[in-house]
Amino acid sequence: MILMKDIVRDGDPVLRQVAQKLTFPLSDHYRKLADDMMEYLVNSQDPKIAAKHQLRAGVGLAAPQVGEGVSMAALLVPDDKGEIIFKEVYVNPEIISESVRKTCLSEGEGCLSVDKVIDGYVPRPNKVTVHYWTVDGEEKAIRLKGYPAIVSGHEIDHLNGHLFYDRINKENPFALDEDTIVIY
């Protein structure tokens, strides 16, 4: 079971490296890693389990965040009522198309690997198409909009050595294009 002590923190070099692509079939080690990352997200969104194990809630977790420099990320995205609207483990994902129009979260973004609050909007494409493989080696492409697109972008950024605050406007952290969609 992944706990907060297992989450790599900002400053660790693995978070700034481009993750290595995985080959199929996945080894038992990487299949277990996928299961463990999803288990963390499920547990972190359950108030009783999260309190018992002192887990910070998460909607996505990339392999580099647990010290594994490979291209894999788990996503468990709820809507504003807490219902799960997207659940997947991406292997070797890439965003192959994105909208010009941006979106962002009204509260900004956070990250399990970043312990401090960093104020500012994190503009991301409102719509993305993600090409990836499942843990079982099935090739997929999915079009996402809004919050699932934001979470996908955040996790894929991890796999490319970027953190959310890299996208915040340094001169004016709350500046947005006038057609940016602000959600939640």
Swiss-Prot record:
Binds 1 Fe(2+) ion. Its EC number is 3.5.1.88. It is an enzyme of class 3 (hydrolase). CDD domains: Pep_deformylase. GO terms for biological process: co-translational protein modification; translation. Gene3D superfamilies: Peptide deformylase (3.90.45.10). It catalyses: N-terminal N-formyl-L-methionyl-[peptide] + H2O = N-terminal L-methionyl-[peptide] + formate. Pfam families: Pep_deformylase. The active site is at 155. NCBIfam families: pept_deformyl. Removes the formyl group from the N-terminal Met of newly synthesized proteins. Requires at least a dipeptide for an efficient rate of reaction. N-terminal L-methionine is a prerequisite for activity but the enzyme has broad specificity at other positions. PANTHER family: PEPTIDE DEFORMYLASE, PEPTIDE DEFORMYLASE 2. HAMAP family: Pep_deformylase. This is Peptide deformylase. It comes from Lactobacillus delbrueckii subsp. bulgaricus (strain ATCC BAA-365 / Lb-18).
